[in-house]
């Protein structure tokens, strides 16, 4: 299945991948199963209404092309790059996961996604000792060649990102690659986009 989807990532229209994963009742596991069964996102999209009908869901409609095109336009407008599972730049460390995100939006240095990574996450309302320890840990990991991954939250996440800016840091964002939360970390997010990498599924 992996080789089939990898080939599809190289030849498919990215809009079809977005339409498939944004369609109702299609999560990551279902996406990968459909791709394995049908060989391409477009073929899976064509099959979905009948598959839904067989499962008792009438009037099923796939995600419209215009929605996917609007997402691509918005992504490009904010300087983001779309990575497809199995395609160039997609993180090798996610490839073997059954529920790996089919698509990732990124801003920044995608080369960091191929390097060894360590996640540092913790309390938003961290103590001063906790913040110092997070910075020290992130600096040490960065110096040893590890990319520090965190979630751009206030507290431990922000401290880890800041300490690893010079050596490589990746922020995984829940709300979207163009949605900075909390707002107080907007400057940090801009620095990560310039020196590291922002990653999101939307």
Stretch-by-stretch model annotation:
Residues 1-13, 84-202:
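Glycine-biased, small-residue-rich flexible motifs in mid-sequence functional cores and linkers
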Residues 1-89:
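Short, small/acidic-rich helices and loops at N termini and domain boundaries
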